[in-house]
Amino acid sequence: IIFKAPLEEPANPTWAPNPAKAPWYFLGLQEMLVYFDPWMAGVVLPVFIIIGLVAIPYIDTNPKGNGYYTFSERKMAISCFMFGWLVLWIFLIIIGTFLRGPNWTFYGPFEYWDFHKVVAEANINLSEIIWIKMLGTTMPSNLIVREIFGIFVILAYFGISGAMITKKWGQDILEKTGKIRYYFFLFLVLFMATLPIKMYLRWLFTLKYIVALPEWELNL
C-alpha cells in the first residue's frame, strides 16, 4: 500500500536505472540472487519454500486448533510457517527495499546512497579456501576431487544434521506423523534453512559457493 509498484513502460535497452530494483514484492527473489545462482534462487528455492508452506497442514495432522487460533497446541505448524514467511520472504524484501542501494551495494538504514561507493569484496569458494589457502597447493584438475570437501559438507549437512535433529527433537514428531511425512518434513526444514545459512556464510566469511562446478552449471 505504501510503496509504489507500477507497471512501467517496456525496458529501454539504452538506459538502466541504478539501483535496478524489481517491484517490492519481487525483491526477495532479487536478494536471493546475491547468494545463489539464478536457477537456484529463481526456481528451486522459491518452489521448495512454497511446497513447504503448503505441506505444513498435511504433515502436521494435529486436530487441535481447527476453527480457532492456538499457538500452544500447534507450535510446529505455526513456527515453520512464520519462519518461511518472515525469515525467508519478508526479511529479504526488507533488505532489498531499504538496505540495497546503487549497484546493489549494501547500505545502512540511514547511510547516504553514494553512487560512486566502491566496496572491495573478494568472495571466494570453499574449494579455493581449502586447496589454496589452507593446503597451499594448486586446484586439482579433476572436478570431483576439487569440490570433494564441499560435496562432503552438503552431504554431512543433510545426513548428520538430520540424524542429530531426529535423535534430539524429532522422535515425538516421528511417532505422530510416521516415517514418510516426517522425513519429508525434515528435508524441507533443512532445505529452507540453507538460505539463511548461506547468507551468514557470505556476510561473515565472504564465502561464494560451497560447491562450485561452473563447468556443469552447478554452483551451491
Q: What do the predicted segments below correspond to?
A:
Residues 1-66, 70-220:
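Hydrophobic cores of alpha-helical transmembrane segments in multi-pass integral membrane proteins
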